[in-house]
């Protein structure tokens, strides 16, 4: 039997991009800077796998608590439990 339990399982439609949004990711998404305490949305960029958070957190909003290398650390409530998610800036979007 084949192995069916990868980190991107059940994401066929969740990580799908619109037809006109395919291609190279803008450089501005790579060099985003966030302030500590700022609210950000987790929107996974499917064309870049490095630094992608778990699919469970796609579409959630969290607060920035720090930076770890090139990635940002966020706190997110998953049910009643507060969790720390580490994600690169390509997968984050500042809340307006």
From Swiss-Prot:
Organismal lineage: Archaea, Methanobacteriati, Methanobacteriota, Stenosarchaea group, Methanomicrobia
Single GO term (MF): structural constituent of ribosome
Protein's UniProt name: Large ribosomal subunit protein eL21
InterPro entries reported for this sequence: Ribosomal_eL21, Ribosomal_eL21_arc, Ribosomal_eL21_CS, Ribosomal_eL21_sf, Translation_prot_SH3-like_sf
Cellular component annotations (GO), alphabetically ordered: ribonucleoprotein complex; ribosome
GO BP: translation
Keywords, alphabetical: Ribonucleoprotein, Ribosomal protein
Protein family membership: Belongs to the eukaryotic ribosomal protein eL21 family.
PANTHER family: 60S RIBOSOMAL PROTEIN L21
The organism of origin for this protein: Methanosphaerula palustris (strain ATCC BAA-1556 / DSM 19958 / E1-9c)
């Amino acid at each position: 039997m084949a192995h069916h339990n990868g980190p991107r399982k059940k994401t066929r439609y969740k990580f799908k991009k619109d037809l006109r949004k395919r291609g190279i990711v803008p450089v501005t998404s790579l060099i985003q800077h966030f302030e500590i305490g700022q609210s950000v949305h987790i929107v996974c960029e499917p064309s870049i796998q490095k630094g992608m958070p778990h699919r469970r957190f796609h579409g959630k909003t969290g607060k920035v608590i720090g930076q770890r290398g090139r990635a940002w650390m966020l706190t997110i409530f998953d049910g009643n439990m507060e969790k720390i998610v580490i994600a690169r800036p390509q997968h984050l979007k500042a809340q307006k």
